[in-house]
Design a protein with these regions (language model features):
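Glycine-rich anion-binding surface patch
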Residues: 1-144
């Protein structure tokens, strides 16, 4: 078996663990301290799974409409008397991890520009709210 197939199987296995933890929290009918315990336990498990190796392809989604955008995607510099935008550094992996966990616990996806990172914090986007509304059974959109 090739290394690529092994890596894909490993990532798929990790993804299933993470998705299971998120589903457990989202489906949970507990409140108060019980909810805090369930959520904090799930966050610990997810953080263990989000290795640098696993995060590498997610970090590649930073700064794209197919992934998620940030306020660090571009940097404006003055070149020859004109301001030009250049690719910025983006956010470090630890901040992206925190925002990623927060977004997924709200039911947002990592793809499709469903959240942005601004000032190191996660904010749902119009696309994210639209996706959440699409998941609500019985909700009908009526734009007249």
């Amino acid at each position: 078996m090739s290394n690529i197939v092994k890596a894909e199987e490993k990532f798929l296995s990790i993804s299933k663990v993470i998705d299971s933890e998120i589903s457990t929290v989202l489906a949970s009918n507990v409140n108060g301290f019980q909810k805090a315990f369930v959520m904090s336990s799930a966050i610990d498990i997810i953080k263990e799974q989000l290795s640098d190796e696993y995060m590498k392809p997610i970090m590649a989604l930073q700064g794209t409409s197919l992934g998620f955008k940030t306020d660090q995607d571009t940097v404006k510099k003055q070149v020859g008397g004109k301001w030009v935008a250049e690719k910025g550094p983006g956010y470090p992996m630890e901040i992206v991890k925190e925002c990623l966990i927060e977004a997924t616990f709200l039911g947002l996806e990592v793809t499709g520009n469903q959240f942005n990172i601004i000032g190191g914090n996660m904010y749902p986007t119009r696309e994210g709210f639209g996706a959440l509304l699409d998941k609500m059974k019985g909700l009908k959109k009526n734009f007249t």
